[in-house]
Amino acid sequence: MKATVRDLDGDDAGEVELPAVFETDYRPDLIKRAVLAAQANRIQDTGTDEYAGLRTPAESPGSGRGMAHVPRQNGRAREVPQAVSGRPAHPPKAEKDRGLDINTKERKLATRSAIAATANADRVEERGHEFDEETDLPLVVSDEFEDLVKTQEAVDVLEALGVYDDIERAEDGKTVRAGRGTTRGRKYTEPKSVLVVTSDDQSLAARNLAGSDVATADEVNVEDLAPGTQAGRLTLWTESALAEVAER
């Protein structure tokens, strides 16, 4: 199985033999498990103050008064979960293990399967990515792309390759997040667009494009390749990155 190598102008620059990893069977079940496990294992432990709701001089009136034994302060119930300012009934426990396990072989197979999905044009299109019909997948570009520094240079290359429409799609899809995250540094949500996989150093030029991510071939993971557990992300590989990903 071969792929066409494009230069920075979008012209043919030869062919390259694709590694065997691109022939891996599609395993959406393992991809989903691997992504969910990675997300779950990043969850920070959450707990509550053990004295929350108990900092009050309230006392129980005891028996023989024809009223409930709940602690009271100025005639009003305190401390119990059903009372105003009472303790939480079932608070989150810091010692709870929120992580998910996945076998090492399954995780590696999920990554290989997600890599192979980037070469399937139908699957990439089903995921919502936009690219020219003439664009061949997997999209391989010469190593000169790794030397680009300015964002505009990367924009010109992506336009020549016929995938810049996907960057614009992500930029137009940027919206204000619903919920509490807007006050916690996560104000906006943005669709994922092009993933750029390089060999050694991450390319600076494509790092600031809307929805794009940059990863090295030895560090790219199943979350990069299948955001939201959906495989088939539009991915740009440099020629050297293909050689390194063969070892995955």
Swiss-Prot record:
Residues 44-109 are annotated as: Disordered. It comes from the Archaea. One of its GO terms (molecular function) is structural constituent of ribosome. Pfam families: Ribosomal_L4 (PF00573). GO terms for cellular component: ribonucleoprotein complex; ribosome. GO terms for biological process: translation. Keywords: Ribonucleoprotein, Ribosomal protein, RNA-binding, rRNA-binding. Residues 92-109 have a biased composition (Basic and acidic residues). Belongs to the universal ribosomal protein uL4 family. One of the primary rRNA binding proteins, this protein initially binds near the 5'-end of the 23S rRNA. It is important during the early stages of 50S assembly. It makes multiple contacts with different domains of the 23S rRNA in the assembled 50S subunit and ribosome. HAMAP family: Ribosomal_uL4_A. PANTHER family: 60S RIBOSOMAL PROTEIN L4 (PTHR19431). Part of the 50S ribosomal subunit. This is Large ribosomal subunit protein uL4. The gene is rpl4.
